[in-house]
Amino acid sequence: MSFTPEVVSRKSGVGVIPSPAPFLTPRLERRRPDSFSNRLDRDNKEVNVQVILRCKPLSEEEQKSSVPRVISCNEMRREVNVLHTIANKQVDRLFNFDKVFGPKSQQRSIYDQAIAPIVHEVLEGFSCTVFAYGQTGTGKTYTMEGGMRKKGGDLPAEAGVIPRAVRHIFDTLEAQNADYSMKVTFLELYNEEVTDLLAQDDSSRSSEDKQRKPISLMEDGKGSVVLRGLEEEVVYSANDIYALLERGSSKRRTADTLLNKRSSRSHSVFTITVHIKEESMGDEELIKCGKLNLVDLAGSENILRSGARDGRAREAGEINKSLLTLGRVINALVEHSSHVPYRDSKLTRLLRDSLGGKTKTCIIATISPSAHSLEETLSTLDYAYRAKNIKNKPEANQKLSKAVLLKDLYLELERMKEDVRAARDKNGVYIAHERYTQEEVEKKARIERIEQLENELNLSESEVSKFCDLYETEKEKLLDVESDLKDCKRNLHNSNKDLLDLKENYIQVVSKLKEKEVIVSRMKASETSLIDRAKGLRCDLQHASNDINSLFTRLDQKDKLESDNQSMLLKFGSQLDQNLKDLHRTVLGSVSQQQQQLRTMEEHTHSFLAHKYDATRDLESRIGKTSDTYTSGIAALKELSEMLQKKASSDLEKKNTSIVSQIEAVEKFLTTSATEASAVAQDIHNLLNDQKKLLALAARQQEQGLVRSMRSAQEISNSTSTIFSNIYNQAHDVVEAIRASQAEKSRQLDAFEMKFKEEAEREEKQALNDISLILSKLTSKKTAMISDASSNIREHDIQEEKRLYEQMSGMQQVSIGAKEELCDYLKKEKTHFTENTIASAESITVMDSYLEDCLGRANDSKTLWETTETGIKNLNTKYQQELNVTMEDMAKENEKVQDEFTSTFSSMDANFVSRTNELHAAVNDSLMQDRENKETTEAIVETCMNQVTLLQENHGQAVSNIRNKAEQSLIKDYQVDQHKNETPKKQSINVPSLDSIEEMRTLFSQNTLSEEHTSLEKISTKQGLGEANNRTPFLEVNK
């Protein structure tokens, strides 16, 4: 907070009449920056507003009524936890602050931990602000002011921030024995009006105006707040400040509410300004200025809970309005809004520099732990928590020169005296108060702008002078460096000359040493190569001996393998003979079984045909009986018709009764005839069904016999094919194993021969003359011996492989031929079986069609009889109904009916005869087809028997051929390699030892070499010849 009072305060006991001119801050001295500017740069960093939270204890009334506590404070972790449940809704929030003080905290601990560092900053020349914020009745005024001072002069334990800060400032300054001056102001903001609480009483004013002096609130050109009419009191001790604080507090507006017995109804600002003389190195005296603003805000108030009415309600509304504006300013600063509503309230205008300005600010948020104040407590915590994010840019106040300050104060005092004198004498210029105030404000703004520009000019000049000094310093350093560089170059040139001379001498010595070194190194290299060559030859000889031993071991393994092959082939021959015998027995059994099945099928076929012939004869006899019955019926009907015609002419009167009786007799006769005809037709139908079942049974039996024959033939084929495949696979595996064995032997022999020749040739080229001659002879003999042995073995293996391959190829051809013949036979058998099946199916289909035709015709006859019976019944019924009415007409039409009846029975007779003839023909045709089917089946059976016999003969011959060829291949043609007498015997080789080779080395004397090196060094030092050469030091060769 930065505001300027209008009038310079009075010394004690001396009253000064205030003038209309505002107080002007003394002009700064034009001077060069000092070391204090570094601290200004350090302090220009942004810092957050410090927020301290204090929770008051529950009051006595709250404790008596057992009000629940909803706030818990953790001072160590600096946390405040709000935990409460309202209508099944839980409130659980956690807040972190810079410092937290619980209900049991003391005034001294709060001041020492939170406020004392701020007072130190004030004494360092900064402007600082401390203000209390919170709900009414939470202890803001108690925190800022505290209890009354004791008479003895010591601060009580209840003393607040303001008295403790005053005592701290005075104690620090007195301890430093500093030269200082201090001024204080105390103002009140009530209902948006600023009043001076330290103003003197005036008898010309009313009792209300004596206590309240209005203060004008304005802003200068830089945005700082200017308070017109505010007086400053100069103080010399802490007791003076305590007295002023008690006097101003007594004038402050308070009231009794339900929440607080002494509730502050206004905001108060107590400001302490201190000027301290600073010690300097020269004669110049500087003064640093510090300012401490202690603000006690009125508490936010709930009108319903506080019981405020009328004027108190308006006061509460203004208080809440100003605090709400303060909250909006805090939100705008936290959210970095482009517009901050400072001008919405005088409170925020006064605190403008403390919130986001150049002042260090500390907020003390006070809350109540009671559940009744939960809403206000949460609001206070939210605003305080958001205020933590406000950033200020603290700047130390500019230091002043004491002489300039005294001069300005003297000029100001003289100007004020002239104004007082002019006012008494009424000799001066009088203008409107508003115009004068505006001109003074503009004048002050211009003066401050000029001062700012002068300060910037001074800073620029100081920087220019600083850079000039720096340039001169760097120039001097550059001259010194150039002189040093010249000396270094001269020394470097002399050192290079000496280095060249030393290099020439060094090169001459090195050339001599190189000659000796080359000679010794060549001798050493030749000796080393000889020893290495001898070692290599010895190693090669050892390898050759090992290889020969391996060769003999391999030959022993080959003999063992040949014996194993012979035993394996014998075993294979016995297994092959046993498998062929089993195959022959299986084929003979299958053939005999097939012959038996064919005979059974033939017997079933003969029995079926005989039974079918008997059934056909029976059918013919039944059809004849049916024809006789029908013929007798027709004859009876004709006789009856003639009798009716004779009696018709003589018995017309008795016609009714006689016709009725005759009709009944005709109905009975027709019913009997129909019954007999139905019985005959049913017998025919049953007989045909029996014939159909017998035919189907015979066909199924024949088909099952053929299927069994086909399955047995397939089983014979599969077993034969499996045996032949096994024979072929075994023979092929034997051939492949022998071939792989021979190839492996040949490859190993070739590799050994090539390796041995290469080693021998390499040894011949590298060995010395004598050793080379001995080794070449030994190598040539062994090479010839191994080549002969390997060539003989290879030729024998090739011949044996050819013979085995030819024998196995013959066996494979025989097995393949037998397999092909068997496959052809199976294909033929399958074709015959398919044809037989088709023929049987066709014959069955024909028989079924004939039987269905017979059944259809029998059903037609039955239907015809039923139709005739139904027509006669209908005619009789109609005739009975019309008999009484049409007796005479019936006599006339009797002849006509007789003719129709005769023609109808004639047509029926003819139709029945034709159908009976057709039935006889169908039965005869079926019988003929059965005979043809019998002949075909007998031919097929005879063919199958012949083919089975032929298969048996061919199979026996093929098995005999396979057995003969296997016996010839495995016993007669198989030969075993007989090479034991031709194989060379194992001989021992004399290999020289390493010690005998090491004895060939030439011994060198280390002393002789050392003497030669010493003499060479002395000679090279004396001569000093040669050019510079980058050579490594000479090393001893034999190390």
Swiss-Prot record:
A Gene Ontology BP annotation from the UniProt entry: microtubule-based movement
Chain positions covered by the region annotation Disordered: 1008-1039
Example GO molecular function: microtubule binding
Location(s), subcellular: Cytoplasm, Cytoskeleton; Cytoplasm, Cytoskeleton, Spindle
Keyword Nucleotide-binding part of the UniProt annotation: yes
PANTHER family recorded: KINESIN-LIKE PROTEIN KIF11, KINESIN-LIKE PROTEIN KIN-5B
Protein name: Kinesin-like protein KIN-5B
Protein species of origin: Arabidopsis thaliana
Encoding gene (name): KIN5B
